A protein has these predicted regions:
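Hydrophobic, well-ordered beta-alpha structural blocks that scaffold small-molecule cofactor pockets
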Residues: 1-124
Length: 124
């Protein structure tokens, strides 16, 4: 399974779980960009233990180990951080079928304008 582009995202998957891997600034920008495309993510995943268990943009942040409990067929993971080289093998090893790069969805927007719209209350 290769890393997919946002253009490969199946809008029929809206009934499925959409999660964002990375709860930092890029993750928050991705969450806003998805919402502007009519896609609501359910939660964030982050490997930083200081973020886990907290909320950002009214969404819970879980650990990668917690993500393993999700339905690997119907969970769509948007990778919104710089650690592709470790996240992609983790997702493959745990049999996730649907994971995406976020660069092309962010290109659709003025990132500086999006940045001013995200919830910056939770800084790490």
């Amino acid at each position: 399974m290769l890393l997919k582009n946002f253009s490969d995202f199946d809008y029929k998957a809206l009934n499925n779980k959409v999660v964002i891997f990375g709860a930092g600034t890029i993750g928050r920008l991705t969450d806003l960009a998805l919402r502007k495309n009519g896609i609501e993510s359910q939660l964030f995943v982050d490997s930083d233990p200081r973020k886990q268990g907290k909320e950002v943009q009214n969404k819970k942040i879980i650990s990668p180990d917690d993500l393993k409990r999700y339905d690997t067929e119907n969970t769509h993971v948007f990778i919104a951080c710089n650690y592709f080289s470790s996240i992609v093998p983790f997702l493959k090893k745990n049999k996730f079928k649907n994971f995406y790069k976020v660069t092309d969805i962010l290109k659709k927007f003025d990132v500086y304008k999006l940045y001013n719209e995200i919830d910056m209350d939770m800084l790490f």
